[in-house]
């Protein structure tokens, strides 16, 4: 993609519709209710910094890799532009589950990533950019208390 095309993809896109806004809020709401709130007493300044940093870096990287490249290269192709990267993104979420399995189970976590990814894929395709789904993805990934504790060796 290169820096300019990546920056353009991350910042461009038509505004989301009301339905899209609702759908893009759901993953973050789920992460807040299932991960952030139940573990809020474990959060200190260092953990919050790791959570926020991980959320921004991971979400941006995943959006560029699994949506941006395919959106740029196959903008009108349903299979290569949307379905193939959705499968890749979903299976991509299986790898960390081998090291730190979700309490929900590996495959439920991967299925959840696929459902969230399908909403983001639709939004990216409709808007022509990653801005809308990136905000949702950052908010969702920044709720990862358990993952941040693991990164700090606090498991």
Model region roles, listed by residue range:
Residues 1-21:
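Membrane-helix interface linkers and caps
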Residues 1, 21-37:
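Hydrophobic core of alpha-helical transmembrane segments in multi-pass integral membrane proteins
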């Amino acid at each position: 993609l290169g820096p300019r095309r990546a920056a353009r993809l991350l910042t461009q896109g038509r505004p989301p519709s009301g339905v899209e806004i609702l759908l893009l809020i759901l993953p973050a709401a789920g992460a807040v209710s299932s991960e952030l709130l139940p573990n809020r007493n474990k959060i200190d300044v260092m953990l919050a910094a790791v959570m926020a940093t991980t959320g921004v870096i991971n979400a941006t990287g995943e959006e560029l890799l699994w949506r941006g490249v395919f959106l740029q290269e196959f903008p009108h192709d349903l299979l290569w532009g949307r379905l193939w990267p959705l499968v890749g993104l979903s299976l991509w979420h299986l790898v960390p589950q081998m090291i730190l399995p979700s309490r929900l189970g590996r495959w439920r976590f991967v299925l959840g990533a696929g459902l969230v990814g399908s909403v983001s894929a639709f939004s990216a395709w409709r808007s022509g950019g990653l801005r809308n789904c990136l905000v949702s993805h950052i908010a969702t990934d920044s709720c990862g208390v358990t993952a941040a504790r693991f990164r700090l060796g606090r498991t």
